[in-house]
Amino acid sequence: MLIKRSFSLSRHRTSVALEPEFWAVLDSEAEKAGKSLAAVVAEIDRKRGLRPLASALRLHALAAAARGT
């Protein structure tokens, strides 16, 4: 099951659908960094290049999980 969340990125709204496990890692990372989830997503968005946002978020979450964060 995918969970869809919406964010404002670069002055426009976008929605991203990810599995709950990926959202849990991203939520945890944001909390530990003292940032909002939207701020973390915006940082990933700025660094993703041509990669689709959902893919960039999944890869970021996998890397965070591998680091144990």
Where are these regions (language model features)?
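Short Lys/Arg-rich basic patches
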Residues: 1-17
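Short, solvent-exposed loop/turn elements at beta->coil junctions and helix N-caps
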Residues: 3-4, 45-47
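Helix-centric, low-specificity signal for extended rod-like, repetitive segments
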Residues: 6, 40-41, 51
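Generic hydrophobic/packing signal
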Residues: 11, 25, 50-52
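Amphipathic alpha-helical recognition patches that constitute DNA-binding helices
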Residues: 13, 17, 36, 52, ...
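C-terminal structural segments of small proteins and small subunits
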Residues: 46-69
